From Swiss-Prot:
The gene is glnD. Residues 343-705 are annotated as: Uridylyl-removing. Residues 461-583 form the HD domain. It comes from Pseudomonas aeruginosa (strain ATCC 15692 / DSM 22644 / CIP 104116 / JCM 14847 / LMG 12228 / 1C / PRS 101 / PAO1). This is Bifunctional uridylyltransferase/uridylyl-removing enzyme. GO terms for biological process: regulation of nitrogen utilization. It catalyses: [protein-PII]-L-tyrosine + UTP = [protein-PII]-uridylyl-L-tyrosine + diphosphate; [protein-PII]-uridylyl-L-tyrosine + H2O = [protein-PII]-L-tyrosine + UMP + H(+).
């Protein structure tokens, strides 16, 4: 514990304060306030964090001793005040609980009831956050035997007041000779850590990690020390060095990592004004500034700070794995004779774990640094790597240099890993965890721990990349065929599966450099393929996949797939069926690996539609594009066949169709045309809007719920409709707006429910939606376009300036308005309100929500049903949209663009 520090607590001054005041509470509160202010100022000035948290514990010791002395405990009383838990270690953060054990010799507490109650009341009154228990030595033993948490807490204890002999007796009766022997304790703690990690999704890379409990957090270091304490009686990192479980460099790294996390935790408590161990978005930017990080042209300060955080916890996880593996080998010796199985002259299995046959294996044959992972892929029965071999891997990483990277033995081994029938993802993760992957591929090393500060990318770039490869592997499993039927079928027939894994490894490799990461990554991928002696065609395919890995997703979500020109342009880009197959599978894996919430039935159906329409175009030949007139004729003929079979008069149908333009038949299937036509012809002419709802199979690919609205056109139709859908908690994915020559509108919306699924066949929900929409369209003044709802906490921290781009599609005679803005409740309704103010008509819309941002595309015309041709009008429209979408944003707006 620290030496006496009068600036923090002056006992003489405190006694004088007590003497001057009628109540002791004010003096105690003043002393607490004083040491808190001094310690916070010292933290802000960069003082050593270990000293700060030890000083805080010392200050609380002084307060507790002064409080304890105010009560009559009797002469030679067998009662002691004992610090336990983190406070017992002598470590205390600004708002951490002060965990206390009032320890008695016997279970008879009655004689001490009055002073105990008075003491605890005083602590409450002076504002100390105390967690307390009152137990006898025997009660401690009974509760510790039954509860892992209790025994763990009692292992870390020190006496604050009273005889230390009570604590010594308590430690004796709760020692490993009486309960929780080291083997049992180790197994329980290992299981506890596994459960805790599962709570945080078994990743160090959560967007808002818990610095204490997440994988790689402070608790992982404490778990190691608790295990060591139970086995060896030692409770510090240097003791692990003496016992041979750590080397000095690892001990130093763990100590510095612990101190970094202590600084983060101290800052969190200080900023939050309470006990807060979650590194929430609310605090990440502030802590980044506090730690001296600044934005630059390539990365935000918060991204650089979080990369430091993720690299620290990754290193802690690596050493936690190493030490626990080592503990397992020592604490859980195999009761059976050791089983040795040679693999080759360099490696063998010892009881199922791979190890080197000699300590100099990596030094003598550096290629073994890669070979070990290939062997584990070839032998999936291998349980893992022995602790000594993990340490040798770590210590031999320096052998990987440029000469190593260009050695054909090493390049061949690395490619062989990608050709393995199983274990690719698992062993790439091991390579990353042991620091081999980033050393072998320096470009991969740059993205380790790199977070993109948004809600769309929920993993660091390296974790996302390895997750993508994991998803590619999952597509090979038979059980995945139901969820990913097309991708599972395609991946089985890829001529060289290793190429898609290489493309996956490199698709985001250039993130964080500035510039177009797809272009830069394609260059890196080409260089990798060349240095690994891949054939020219393979090299070009991998590079092309990296360069275009976003194109299929962007096309599917932002363009009108009913437009034959869109399909033709995309088919020209891919060129052949092989490129299409590889790109489709890569896109499916990329979306799933970016954020699990992104993959829904709608996105799946859009990609499937784009794939199949492109496949048809390629089979037909790029020199034979789809003829629009022929497509319209085919749709009408098929629809008419259905209608006639249903008893609808052909003349009535054709009369209705004559009022519709070509776009209607290009943008709807024959089945939908027949469905709409029959319902319209049977709908009473009483002015009530017609609202139809069904599960959609648009072009046999889309999956969602289709809402079809037929009603007399009105000025505010789109604005009112989207506002009503917002209030009904519907997420609009697509909108197709058709206005007939008789001034009726035929609008089709593809929607998902709030949970991301289609509405389904729930009669009550369908009735609610139908009635809500009819009411809104009959009473439009009751539906304001500004939806007032609370903005979710996480969205508040990702505000950015809305961007509005307007261009002209001369072929379709519409203006294309693209909006990129922070997601907010009622955003689409706000946009609809602006369109209403400017007397604009929406012909089509593509809606995409990506994490905290929306990327929506609207095809609009003016009051004369023409594209927007007036630059001044466009500027005013942009300004109005930016102003409306910037509300509650808190950021300056960025310039927008007009491209005619």
């Amino acid at each position: 514990m620290p030496q006496v520090d009068p600036e923090l607590f002056d006992r003489g001054q405190f006694q004088a304060e007590l003497a001057l005041k009628s109540s002791p509470i004010a003096a105690f509160k003043k002393a607490i306030r004083q040491f808190r202010e001094v310690l916070d100022n010292r933290f802000n000035s960069g003082r050593d964090i270990r000293r700060l948290i030890e000083d805080r514990a010392w200050c609380v010791d002084q307060i507790l001793q002064q409080a304890w002395q105010r009560f009559d405990w009797g002469d030679d009383a067998d009662i002691a005040l004992v610090a336990v838990g983190g406070y017992g270690r002598g470590e205390l953060h600004p708002y951490s609980d002060v965990d206390l054990l009032i320890l008695l010799d016997s279970e008879d507490q009655e004689s001490f009831r009055e002073p105990i109650e008075g003491f605890l009341t005083l602590l409450w009154d002076i504002g100390l956050e105390v967690g307390q228990s009152v137990r006898s030595v025997q009660q401690c033993a009974e509760e510790a035997r039954a509860d892992l948490t209790v025994i763990t807490t009692l292992m870390e204890c020190r006496t604050i007041c009273g005889p230390d002999s009570l604590r010594q007796r308590m430690l004796q009766v709760t020692g490993s000779a009486h309960m929780w022997p080291s083997k049992e304790f180790f197994l329980a703690k290992r299981h506890e850590q596994q459960r805790r990690h599962a709570k945080y999704n078994d990743t160090e890379y959560n967007l808002e990690p818990n610095v204490k409990g997440s994988p790689g957090g402070l608790r992982d270091i404490q778990t190691i020390l608790w295990m060591a304490r139970r086995q060896f009686g030692s409770l510090n990192l240097h003791a692990l060095v003496r016992e041979g479980f750590l080397v000095e460099s690892e001990c130093s790294m763990l100590a510095s990592s612990q101190e970094f996390l202590w600084r983060v935790r101290y800052a969190l408590h200080m900023l939050a004004g309470r006990a807060e161990d979650r590194l929430l978005f609310d605090h990440q930017r502030s802590i980044a500034r506090l730690f001296g990080y600044e934005d630059n042209d390539v990365k935000l300060a918060v991204e650089r700070f979080m990369q430091k955080y993720y690299r620290v916890v990754m290193a802690i996880s690596e050493l936690n794995d190493l030490i626990i593996q080592h503990f397992e080998e020592v604490i859980l010796p195999c009761e059976q004779p050791v089983q040795i199985q040679p693999l080759n002259s360099r490696f063998q299995l010892r009881d199922g774990y791979i190890e080197v046959t000699h300590p100099n294996v990596f030094k003598r044959t550096p290629f073994a640094l890669l070979e070990i992972f290939v062997l584990m892929a070839q032998h999936p029965e291998i349980k893992g790597v022995r602790a000594d071999t993990i340490r040798l891997l770590r210590d031999s990483r320096h052998l990987i240099d440029d000469e190593f990277r260009h050695d054909i033995r090493n390049t061949s081994l690395f490619i062989e890993l990608f050709k393995s029938s199983q274990g690719i993802h698992r062993n790439l993760r091991r390579m990353n965890r042991y620091g081999i992957l980033g050393r072998y591929l320096p470009e991969f090393g740059h993205i380790i721990g790199q977070m993109q500060h948004d809600l769309f990318h929920i993993y660091t770039v390296d974790a996302h990349t390895l997750n993508l490869i994991k998803h590619l592997r999952k597509l090979n499993r038979p059980e995945m065929a139901e969820k990913y039927p097309l991708a599972s079928k395609i991946i089985d027939r890829l001529p060289k599966p290793e190429l898609i894994y290489i493309a996956g490894l490199y698709h985001d490799i250039a993130k964080g450099r500035g510039g177009d990461h797809s272009e830069l990554g394609a260059v890196d991928a080409e260089a990798f393929c060349q240095s690994h002696q891949l054939p020219l065609w393979d090299t070009q395919l991998v590079s092309w996949l990296v360069q275009n890995h976003l194109v299929m997703s962007t096309t599917a979500q932002r363009k009108d797939l009913s437009d034959p020109q869109v399909i033709f342009d995309f088919a020209q880009l891919v060129g052949d069926q092989t490129h299409l197959d590889y790109l489709y599978v890569l896109t499916v894996a990329d979306i799933n690996a970016t954020n699990p919430t992104l993959w829904n039935s709608w996105r799946a159906s859009l990609l499937r539609q784009l794939y199949t329409e492109t496949k048809r175009a390629l089979r037909r030949g790029l020199e034979n594009p789809v003829d629009r007139e022929e497509q319209i004729r085919q749709t009408q003929t098929a629809a008419l066949d259905q209608l006639v079979r249903n008893g609808i008069d052909q003349d009535d149908a054709e009369q209705l169709w004559s009022q519709l333009g070509d776009d209607y038949f290009l943008r709807h299937t024959a089945g939908d045309v027949a469905w709409h036509t029959e319902a319209i012809l049977q709908h009473p002419d009483d002015g009530t809007p017609l609202v139809l709802i069904k599960e959609t199979t648009q072009r046999e690919f889309e999956s969602g719920s289709q809402i079809f609205i037929y009603a007399a056109d009105q000025h505010d139709f789109f604005a009112v409709t989207v506002a009503a859908m917002d209030q009904l908690n519907l997420s609009i994915q697509d909108a197709r707006i058709i206005t007939s020559t008789s001034q009726f509108t035929l609008d089709t919306y593809i929607v998902l429910d709030a949970d991301g699924d289609s509405i389904g066949n729930n009669p009550e929900r369908i009735a609610e939606i139908r009635e809500g929409l009819i009411d809104a369209l009959k009473n439009p003044d009751d539906y304001p376009t500004i939806i007032q709802r609370r903005v979710p906490r996480q969205l508040k921290h990702f505000a950015f300036a809305p961007q509005v781009t307007i261009s002209t599609d001369a072929l379709r005679q519409v203006s294309v308005l693209e909006v990129i803005a922070p997601d907010r409740p009622g955003l689409l309704a706000r946009i609809g309100g602006i369109f209403l103010d400017f007397d604009l008509s929406v012909q089509n819309a593509k809606i995409a929500t990506l994490g905290e941002r929306v990327e929506d595309v609207f095809y609009i015309t003016d009051a004369r049903n023409q594209p927007l041709a007036d630059p001044d009008l466009c500027k005013r429209l942009q300004a109005a949209l930016v102003e409306q979408l910037s509300q509650d944003n808190g950021r300056d707006t960025l310039p927008t663009r007009i491209n005619f």
